[in-house]
């Protein structure tokens, strides 16, 4: 799936684990996010299928991003995961993982996202739920001012 403009921007900003796993945002907008990861040897476990921790990280990242989309230039929304529930139902040893998350409910402090992980053929591999806590001001769609980068 070709990425949306917002998704393309986010991909440039993936850091840490999701960058290491090869995650790419293919859709991102108000209350939804889609992230894909190609299955490679580096994300497989000892029985040659995707490690459950990779599925959990994918659900966590997609679910969190669904809750923090901000379309305002120069602004951002922040949140942290306070609860993560993952149900592993099937697995693959090759292909692509596609995580589709959507916000089910959001308030001033907390949001809840649900996420399904499927393979490229649409077979359900995992489901999950993310409960996120917004940082101050991040519950608003316009978010907060993006902090300037330290140039020192």
Model-derived segments and their meaning:
Residues 1-152:
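Terminal targeting signals and extreme-terminal segments of soluble enzymes
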């Amino acid at each position: 799936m070709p990425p949306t403009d917002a998704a393309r921007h986010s991909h440039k900003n993936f850091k840490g684990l999701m960058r290491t796993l090869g995650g790419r945002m293919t859709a991102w907008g108000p209350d939804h996010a889609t992230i894909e990861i190609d299955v490679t040897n580096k994300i497989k476990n000892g029985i040659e299928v995707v490690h459950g921790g990779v599925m959990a990280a994918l659900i966590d990242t997609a679910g969190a991003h669904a809750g923090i989309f901000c379309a305002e230039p120069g602004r951002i929304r922040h949140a942290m995961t306070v609860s993560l529930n993952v149900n592993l139902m099937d697995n693959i040893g090759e292909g692509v993982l596609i995580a589709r998350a959507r916000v089910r409910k959001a308030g001033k402090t907390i949001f809840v996202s649900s996420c399904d992980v499927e393979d490229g053929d649409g077979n359900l591999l995992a489901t999950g739920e993310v409960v996120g806590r917004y940082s101050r001001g991040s519950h608003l769609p316009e978010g907060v001012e993006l902090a300037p980068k330290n140039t020192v």
